[in-house]
Amino acid sequence: MRIVVGMSGASGAIYGIRILEALQRIGVETDLVMSDSAKRTIAYETDYSISDLKGLATCVHDINDVGASIASGSFRHAGMIIAPCSIKTLSAVANSFNTNLLIRAADVALKERRKLVLMLRETPLHLGHLRLMTQATENGAVLLPPLPAFYHRPKTLDDIINQSVTKVLDQFDLDVDLFGRWTGNEERELAKSR
């Protein structure tokens, strides 16, 4: 299996990084494309270097290389994840505004009817944002903002990140076992009674 991973400049670079780590761990090949803003966000928010990220991906593409393999529908892959996804990137994807390889690869995923998952990072949202989300969804994208769940009783920031990353990879039917899944009220009640 091969998945394209795009990273925009939105806050939340750790989501893209953790996705790359998880995919590498389970042997999924990845094509990585990062915007220039993503590189700045990675440096600002994390201790990872761009070299570290390149080591996590099978292949790394320059944002301006619109002739790269992932810019063509004939290049086979299971789909694409943009994590994090800025509103600017959402807007370009929703409107097929192919100004760089990140957007072109997303547009190709949509036109080829492949999975495109967008980890949108913005709050609060105004009506224009909601309309862009609707338009992207109507075009075939899956909007999956990293909203934390608490039923698994997260104890660390990593627990919260891992739950969202697992939700993204569930879209590709990949089991990465990064957090405790919901097993039902029965087990919780049984544990409390002991």
Swiss-Prot record:
- Whether Transport counts among this entry's keywords is no
Alphabetical list of SUPFAM superfamilies matching this protein: Homo-oligomeric flavin-containing Cys decarboxylases, HFCD (SSF52507)
Q: Which reaction does it catalyse?
A: dimethylallyl phosphate + FMNH2 = prenylated FMNH2 + phosphate
Entry keyword Nucleus: no
> Which residues are dimethylallyl phosphate-binding?
Y151, K167
Q: What is its EC number?
A: 2.5.1.129
Q: Which domain of life is it from?
A: Bacteria
Where is FMN bound in this sequence? G9, A10, S11, S35, S86, I87, K88, T89, R121
Q: Which InterPro entries match?
A: Flavin_trans-like, Flavoprotein, UbiX-like
Q: Which GO terms describe its molecular function?
A: carboxy-lyase activity; flavin prenyltransferase activity
Keywords attached to this entry: Flavoprotein, FMN, Prenyltransferase, Transferase
What the entry lists under Pfam families is as follows:
Flavoprotein
Q: Which family does it belong to?
A: Belongs to the UbiX/PAD1 family.
Q: What PANTHER family does the record tag this protein with?
A: FLAVIN PRENYLTRANSFERASE, FLAVIN PRENYLTRANSFERASE PAD1, MITOCHONDRIAL
- What does the protein in this record do? Involved in the carboxylation of phenylphosphate. Flavin prenyltransferase that catalyzes the synthesis of the prenylated FMN cofactor (prenyl-FMN) for 4-hydroxy-3-polyprenylbenzoic acid decarboxylase UbiD. The prenyltransferase is metal-independent and links a dimethylallyl moiety from dimethylallyl monophosphate (DMAP) to the flavin N5 and C6 atoms of FMN.
Protein name, entry field: Flavin prenyltransferase UbiX
Q: What is the species of this protein?
A: Thauera aromatica
